[in-house]
């Protein structure tokens, strides 16, 4: 049996832009993608801590060092610049290995600076 387990999350991210007319996705600074292990075009969940909205989309690269978290397309109706969010990706893990699985957790601070990664 394969279990769906947390692969990685960006915790405490701040939305820096919303673009309703973009084709969709969430744009994430390449440094943050690298730190979390989330890949471009990978399916992610975004949970809006500010208002409770929860959506599923895919990640795109934003310029390295920009600290961008940009919610695009229809999802932009559920997010606003300044909202605090959690972005999570999941993976399939064989049940026998699930207890040994350890996700990557990246805690973000002001300006989407990395405070801690584990």
Curated annotation (Swiss-Prot):
Substrate binds at residues 57, 73-75. Its EC number is 4.1.1.11. It is found in: Cytoplasm. The modification Pyruvic acid (Ser) is found at residue 25. Keywords: Autocatalytic cleavage, Cytoplasm, Decarboxylase, Lyase, Pantothenate biosynthesis, Pyruvate, Schiff base, Zymogen. The active site is at 25 (schiff-base intermediate with substrate), 58 (proton donor). Binds 1 pyruvoyl group covalently per subunit. The keyword Cytoplasm applies. NCBIfam families: panD (TIGR00223). HAMAP family: PanD (MF_00446). Belongs to the PanD family. This is Aspartate 1-decarboxylase. The lineage of its organism: Bacteria, Pseudomonadati, Pseudomonadota, Alphaproteobacteria, Hyphomonadales.
